[in-house]
From Swiss-Prot:
The protein's role, per its UniProt record: Seems to play a negative regulatory role in 5-phosphoribose 1-diphosphate synthesis.
Modified residues (Phosphothreonine): 5
Family recorded in the similarity comment: Belongs to the ribose-phosphate pyrophosphokinase family.
Organism for this UniProt entry: Homo sapiens
Sequence positions bearing Phosphoserine: 219, 227, 233
NCBIfam families, sorted: ribP_PPkin
GO molecular-function terms, A-Z: enzyme inhibitor activity; enzyme regulator activity; identical protein binding; magnesium ion binding
Name this polypeptide is given: Phosphoribosyl pyrophosphate synthase-associated protein 2
Length: 369
């Protein structure tokens, strides 16, 4: 596992105040690796807690030490059973609240349901609902990483620190990709162009944008709500009304804006889950002359048969952080590499507990990052 260690953070982190308790809210042991790394860096023991499933599938949490008057940090990494993961977190937060904890800080590197942060058809904004549930349960602060949409921070009525994984991914590119100076940063769609531009400017590299790919779930075209109503129902409202309709979108044939011929292509995004768009982008880049293709993302959900499809694809390497456990996927696909981000989470915990400024962790981060 690739790990970045800035010189100023090489020594064990100094917890100057007492009263810190670190819990892992996961009942799944494979999801506790990140918690153990954070505890080791902080030089503290994991708090004593039992999280398990009853035979009737109900979640039960038993806190086995006093948290009265203490700063409680609850680390929750998302497993495949995301709904169980959420219930484990909510029950543990509420248990700490009713046990008179001084503050309850959630450390949730990947915020679940973050893709459902916009209204879809007759659905709902689920990430807003989840934020309200966490606040109601008793969460007083949230530490997360690379939210799918930064606007999700506004769903909370508590402080939210949205950390960035890009410094770790940038250093991986510089240290682990030979001849990265001959690379071009690629956005697989115009929606991810800002992230690609941020990487390109920091690495002093060129940028390419793929446009015209198949319609994705983030676009306006799939929003099935009709307000104003569709043409066939307009006449039923009032015969004298003539409300203009928005012209439907038509995507052009797939196009690569930028030169990738004879270059290393590095596709950057925040999440890699369903790999269809990444595989299509890789095929297009190969056709345009790219001789090596990397994919860099913060959160590696890698659902379903994603590892097998990546292994059989034109992609040479997929680099993700350990915000989400993916050891099984790595066994299925040797192309998947991991960057450890436990250091920045540990430092955030230390600073919040000691009452120090968090600005150090947001150096050189702009509005578009």
């Amino acid at each position: 596992m690739f790990c970045v260690t800035p010189p100023e953070l090489e020594t064990k982190m100094n917890i100057t105040k007492g009263g810190l308790v670190l819990f892992s809210a996961n009942s799944n042991s494979s999801c506790m690796e990140l918690s153990k790394k954070i505890a080791e860096r902080l030089g503290v023991e994991m708090g004593k807690v039992q999280v398990y499933q009853e035979p009737n599938r109900e979640t039960r949490v038993q806190i086995q030490e006093s948290v009265r008057g203490k700063d409680v940090f609850i680390i929750q990494t998302v497993s495949k059973d995301v709904n169980t993961t959420i219930m484990e977190l909510l029950i543990m937060v509420y248990a700490c609240k009713t046990s008179c904890a001084k503050s309850i800080i959630g450390v949730i590197p990947y915020f679940p349901y973050s893709k459902q942060c916009k209204m879809r058809k007759r659905g709902s904004i689920v990430s807003k609902l989840l934020a309200s549930m966490m606040c109601k349960a008793g969460l007083t602060h949230l530490i997360t990483m690379d939210l799918h949409q930064k606007e999700i921070q506004g769903f909370f009525n508590i402080p939210v620190d949205n950390l960035r994984a890009s410094p770790f991914l940038l250093q991986y590119i510089q240290e682990e990709i030979p001849d990265y100076r001959n690379a071009v940063i690629v956005a697989k769609s115009p929606a991810s162009a800002k992230r690609a531009q941020s990487f390109a400017e920091r690495l002093r590299l060129g940028i390419a944008v793929i446009h015209g790919e198949a319609q994705d779930a983030e676009s306006d075209l799939v929003d099935g709500r009709h307000s104003p109503p569709m043409v066939r129902s307009v006449a039923a409202i009032h015969p004298s009304l003539e409300i203009p309709m928005l012209i439907p979108k038509e995507k052009p044939p797939i196009t690569v804006v930028g030169d990738v011929g004879g270059r290393i292509a590095i596709i950057v995004d925040d999440i890699i889950d369903d790999v269809d768009s990444f595989l299509a982008a890789a095929e297009t880049l190969k056709e345009r002359g790219a001789y090596k293709i990397f994919v860099m993302a913060t959160h590696g959900l890698l659902s379903s048969d994603a590892p097998r499809r990546i292994e059989e694809s034109a992609i040479d390497e997929v680099v993700v952080t350990n915000t989400i456990p993916h050891e099984v996927q790595k066994l299925q696909c040797p192309k998947i590499k991991t960057v450890d981000i436990s250091m920045i989470l540990s430092e955030a915990i230390r600073r919040i507990h000691n009452g120090e400024s968090m600005s150090y962790l947001f150096r050189n981060i702009g509005l578009d990052d």
